[in-house]
């Protein structure tokens, strides 16, 4: 289907790019991206994907908007406090871009529902704030052969990596297992600078856009870290040997999804 005159104007700064053009914009409009977590990472990622014209955006989050969220979760407004995050996010996106269909999942992801939720999406963004959820997302995406972007933020630091089936290590290749409960402070205990979510969440959106367009180099096989205090990015090459991984290796020992105990941070 041809782009409308309004779409040509709306996405004109995309279309003029040789890496995008009208063909690439149509790819974006036909794409489906799932964001798990409508918080500090998921909020900016969702807004930039919506602005870019990603045609279907899924948002999964069981929580309600809290006043303390507004310091960084820019998709929500003061009037949204007490509202379901998925509903608040949907309303913001609908007001921003009528080209975008928003699917909402007001539920915690578990081993029982995640495969059904992710099955229809082209790319998954992990915007969660706890290790059990991150390992569950990783394992589900590996088993379902879904590309995804992992990210995490705390204090003045952030990190992200991208997994594409068959093109490098997964999250479990690098981090093996969740740390013991209480071994790592929650975001409520440690704090996080608000703009950190904007920096890292926007990079997650960029990874999704590049994957959809098929342009550039993704963060497969690399972990990108950012320190806002020193204003330094570091791109760390990850081990390329994935054969021994418990989930994506040649002889996986994890063949069923695991529900580790989740400690939900109201400030993610």
Give the ranges of each region predicted by the language model.
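Adenine nucleotide-associated cytosolic modules
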Residues: 1-268
């Amino acid at each position: 289907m041809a782009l409308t005159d309004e779409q040509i104007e709306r996405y004109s700064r995309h279309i003029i790019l040789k890496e995008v053009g009208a063909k690439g914009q149509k790819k974006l409009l036909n794409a489906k991206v799932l964001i798990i977590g409508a918080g500090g990472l998921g909020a900016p990622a969702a807004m930039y994907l919506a602005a870019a014209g990603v045609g279907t955006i899924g948002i999964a989050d069981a929580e309600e908007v809290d006043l303390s969220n507004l310091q960084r979760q820019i998709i929500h407004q003061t009037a949204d406090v007490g509202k379901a995050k998925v509903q608040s996010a949907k309303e913001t996106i609908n007001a921003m871009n009528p080209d975008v269909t928003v699917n909402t999942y007001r539920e915690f992801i578990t081993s029982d529902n995640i495969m059904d939720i992710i099955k229809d999406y082209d790319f998954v963004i992990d915007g969660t704030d706890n290790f059990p959820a991150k390992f569950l997302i990783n394992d589900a995406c590996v088993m379902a052969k879904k590309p995804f972007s992992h990210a995490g933020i705390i204090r003045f630091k952030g990190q992200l990596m991208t997994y594409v089936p068959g093109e490098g290590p997964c999250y479990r290749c690098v981090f093996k297992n969740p740390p013991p409960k209480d071994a790592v402070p929650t975001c409520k205990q440690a704090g996080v600078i608000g703009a950190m979510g904007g920096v890292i969440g926007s990079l997650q959106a960029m990874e999704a856009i590049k994957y959809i367009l098929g342009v550039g180099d993704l963060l497969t096989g690399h972990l990108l870290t950012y320190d806002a205090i020193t204003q330094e990015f570091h791109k760390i090459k990850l081990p390329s040997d994935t054969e021994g991984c418990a989930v994506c290796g040649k002889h996986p020992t994890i063949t069923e999804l695991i529900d580790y105990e989740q400690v939900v941070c109201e400030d993610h």
